[in-house]
């Protein structure tokens, strides 16, 4: 079974009738296959911004994900230093999810079918981050309107049923995290993803203030690197 079929270009008006015929035939063979919209417009199911993350939450019901090479291009890059790093992957993934999309990292093999060791290492690092923070990424949704972010270093997602909001700090918040657009339920337990210890929090004039334990100021005692997720049950959930 084919989950997704990626078309990569517009072939022009002379070829279009054959392309359309092929698309319709594919739909008959497998109605639930998802087709990339590039070159086929409304016949497609999802679209793919390439080489950039949209600047704001996308006002669309059409699925989308960013495609971005880890090196200098989607083909094999032999230079280790050209690979952008696990921190770059995580930051852009969180940013894309907060805006209602997803993030695909592109890497290419060499002539023998092998991937660069640096690319493999960086993907594994990002995978370790996802093991800790996946609850705030997988099957989540963007928050409404402009609530996807607070400033440059805070991003949000929510569960489909709205019973949990996830705040991601793209920079370590220090001893306190202030969230201005989330109001927790009175009995909400706020915790950092990857830990079981409830965090103390209070409502202030600025919003909700979450206190980070002194022990976590030591990098080695944090559950992950790059970005830190906090799970909150919002008021009314």
Please report, for each region that a protein language model flagged, where it lies by residue.
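Mature catalytic domains of secreted/periplasmic carbohydrate-active enzymes
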Residues: 1-237
């Amino acid at each position: 079974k084919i989950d997704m079929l990626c078309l990569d270009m517009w072939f022009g008006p002379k070829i279009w009738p054959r392309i359309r015929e092929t698309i319709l035939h594919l739909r008959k063979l497998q109605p639930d296959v998802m087709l990339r919209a590039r070159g086929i417009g409304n016949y497609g199911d999802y679209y793919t911004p390439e080489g950039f993350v949209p600047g704001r939450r996308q006002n669309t019901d059409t699925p989308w994900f960013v495609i971005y090479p880890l090196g200098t291009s989607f083909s094999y890059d032999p230079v280790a230093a050209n690979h952008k790093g696990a921190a770059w992957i995580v930051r852009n993934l969180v940013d894309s999810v907060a805006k209602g999309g997803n993030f695909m990292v592109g890497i290419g093999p060499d002539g023998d079918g092998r991937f660069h060791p640096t690319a493999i290492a960086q993907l594994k690092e990002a995978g370790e981050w996802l093991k800790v923070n996946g609850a705030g990424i997988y099957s989540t949704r963007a928050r409404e309107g402009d609530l996807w972010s607070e400033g440059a270093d805070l991003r949000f997602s929510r569960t489909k049923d709205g019973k949990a909001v996830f705040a991601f700090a793209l920079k370590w918040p220090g001893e306190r995290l202030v969230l201005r657009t989330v109001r927790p339920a009175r009995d909400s337990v706020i915790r950092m993803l990857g830990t079981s210890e409830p965090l103390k929090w209070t409502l202030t004039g600025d919003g909700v203030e979450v206190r980070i334990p002194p022990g976590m100021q030591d990098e080695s005692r944090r559950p992950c690197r790059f970005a830190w997720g906090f799970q909150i049950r919002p008021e009314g959930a």
